[in-house]
C-alpha cells in the first residue's frame, strides 16, 4: 500500500510519500526432493519506502529544490532468500533487506531562451545481494558439488554533481547538453559463509570442504572481502553530451549528438581461486581496470508529411557516425 501528501502555496511546493510491501519467496522442487518435502518454507520480507522533497521559486527565473528518500527492499530470490535456488530449498538464515538512502540539493534556471538544472547527490547502498561459488572436488579432481558463499554487508557510496541545459538562441535551433561527474566506491568489508548445494554449512579442513557443526559455528568456513574504497564498475563516472536540433523547415528536422564516457571501470568479480586461497581469511580486492575513455556521435533526421490526409513521419538515425571503435 502507499500514500502521499502534497503542499503547494505561493512560491513553495512540497511532497511526502511512502509505501509498504511484503515479498514472500518459496520454491517447489520435485527434481531433488520427494513429494513430501518438495515445497520449501515461505520467507517473507517487509519492505518500505519513504521519500519527500520541496521546491522554492525564488522568482520567475530561479528555483532551488531538495529531495530525500529511503528504500528498504527484499533481497533477490537467488543468492539472497535462498542459498542455492536452483537445487535446494534451504533458505538463507542471514538474508536481510537491501537498503538505499539518498538525498539531493539543486538549483534551476528558467527563461524563454535558456533552461538549466544543477544538482549534487549522495546515495548510500547497504546490504546489496551478492553471491559466488567454488567447486567441491573429490580426490581425483572431479567436481562433486558447489560451495556457495553469500556475502553480507556489501555497501557502496555514490555521490556526484550533475548539470543539464537546453538553449534556444533562435526559433529554429535547440542546443542541449549535460555533464555529470561522480565518485562511486564500495565502502565495506563484507563477510560470507560457505554452504553446499543442499544448504548445509561447510567447514574447511586439510584443504577439503567437510560438513560444519552448524550455521555460523566456529568451524563454519568463511571469506571476508575488503572492498573499502574500490571503484564501482560497470558505469561511466564521468559523462558529458552535447547536441543540437535544427528545424530546417516546418516539416524537416536534423539533429546531431555526441556523448563522452570517462572513468568507466570494469566490475569486480570473485574468482573461484580467490575463494579457495582465502578461506577463513580476508581477500583484499584492488581497484579494477579503468576502461579507456570514449565518445560516440549520432546523426538523426525526421520529415513530416501527409499520406491520404493522414499525418506521417519518416525518420532515420545514423549511430556512431564517425565509426569510433575504442
Question: What residue spans do the PLM features occupy?
Answer:
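Signature of Gram-negative outer-membrane beta-barrel scaffolds
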Residues: 1-62, 79, 84-85, 191
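Extracellular loop and loop/strand-boundary signature of outer-membrane beta-barrel proteins
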Residues: 1-3, 32-41, 87-93, 102, ...
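Residues on the lipid-exposed face of transmembrane beta-strands in outer-membrane beta-barrel proteins
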Residues: 5-7, 52-56, 105-111, 161-167, ...
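Surface-exposed extracellular loop regions of Gram-negative outer-membrane beta-barrel proteins
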Residues: 24-31, 58-103, 115, 120-152, ...
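Gram-negative outer-membrane beta-barrel transporters
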Residues: 122-124, 149-270
Amino acid at each position: 500500500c502507499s500514500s502521499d501528501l502534497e503542499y503547494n502555496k505561493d512560491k513553495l511546493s512540497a511532497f511526502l510519500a511512502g509505501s509498504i510491501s511484503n515479498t514472500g519467496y518459496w520454491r517447489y522442487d520435485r527434481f531433488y526432493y520427494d513429494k513430501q518435502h518438495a515445497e520449501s518454507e515461505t520467507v517473507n520480507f517487509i519492505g518500505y519506502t519513504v521519500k519527500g522533497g520541496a521546491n522554492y521559486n525564488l522568482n520567475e527565473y530561479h528555483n532551488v529544490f531538495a529531495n530525500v528518500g529511503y528504500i528498504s527492499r527484499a533481497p533477490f530470490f537467488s543468492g539472497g532468500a535462498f542459498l542455492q535456488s536452483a537445487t535446494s530449498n534451504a533458505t538463507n538464515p542471514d538474508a536481510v533487506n537491501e537498503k538505499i538512502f539518498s538525498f539531493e540539493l539543486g538549483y534551476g534556471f528558467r527563461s524563454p531562451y535558456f533552461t538549466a538544472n544543477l544538482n549534487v547527490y549522495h546515495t548510500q547502498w547497504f546490504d546489496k545481494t551478492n553471491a559466488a561459488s567454488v567447486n567441491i572436488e573429490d580426490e581425483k579432481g572431479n567436481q562433486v558439488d558447489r560451495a556457495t558463499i553469500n556475502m553480507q554487508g556489501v555497501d557502496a557510496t555514490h555521490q556526484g554533481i550533475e548539470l543539464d541545459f537546453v538553449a534556444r538562441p533562435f526559433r529554429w535551433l535547440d542546443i542541449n547538453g549535460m555533464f555529470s561527474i561522480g565518485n562511486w566506491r564500495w565502502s565495506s568489508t563484507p563477510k560470507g559463509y560457505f554452504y553446499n548445494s543442499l544448504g548445509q554449512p561447510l567447514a574447511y579442513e586439510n584443504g577439503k570442504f567437510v560438513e560444519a557443526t552448524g550455521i555460523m559455528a566456529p568451524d563454519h568456513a568463511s571469506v571476508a572481502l575488503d572492498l573499502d574504497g574500490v571503484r564501482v564498475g560497470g558505469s561511466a563516472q564521468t559523462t558529458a553530451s552535447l547536441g543540437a536540433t535544427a528545424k530546417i523547415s516546418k516539416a524537416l528536422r536534423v539533429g546531431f549528438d555526441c556523448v563522452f564516457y570517462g572513468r568507466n571501470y570494469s566490475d569486480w568479480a570473485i574468482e573461484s581461486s580467490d575463494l579457495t586461497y582465502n578461506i577463513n581469511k580476508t581477500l583484499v580486492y584492488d581497484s579494477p581496470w579503468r576502461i579507456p575513455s570514449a565518445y560516440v556521435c549520432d546523426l538523426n533526421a525526421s520529415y513530416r508529411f501527409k499520406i491520404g490526409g493522414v499525418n506521417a513521419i519518416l525518420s532515420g538515425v545514423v549511430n556512431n557516425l564517425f565509426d569510433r571503435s575504442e
